[in-house]
């Protein structure tokens, strides 16, 4: 990790209650193995929570939104452990879950500060005829689950997929990004 302290104090300090609205932690692979159905697009370096918190404190960032990395698939353990450590007063989270995840699991996630579900598809995924249509049942089911909890949907995917999903996105009954 870059030794930010060797560089001295930052030229600009974040204002009080500043929030990093999208960051990810990567734990030791032996404890948090990558779980991707496809080969990983990149090999994430270990990026533990203490290193990030140290940098955030140096910059004056007090609050955080954890976003589930695609490298972990639907295994949110690393992120949820980090959220437990930080505490609900300082963080929120966006998970990747199967549309049929048990209500009790979602309730536990909500209690930790989770407020959204991420639908992850590789941003470099080649266009496949009918793929966006095949996603619609999952999107609608996750939309319903999010609506029950007051959560939002977060999408990661290639531009062609976003373009094909625009009519669906416009009709969602939950916020999305």
Regions found by a protein language model. Give the residues of each.
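Mid-domain alpha/beta scaffold segments of enzyme catalytic cores
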Residues: 2-149
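Catalytic pocket-lining loop regions of alpha/beta-barrel enzymes
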Residues: 132-177
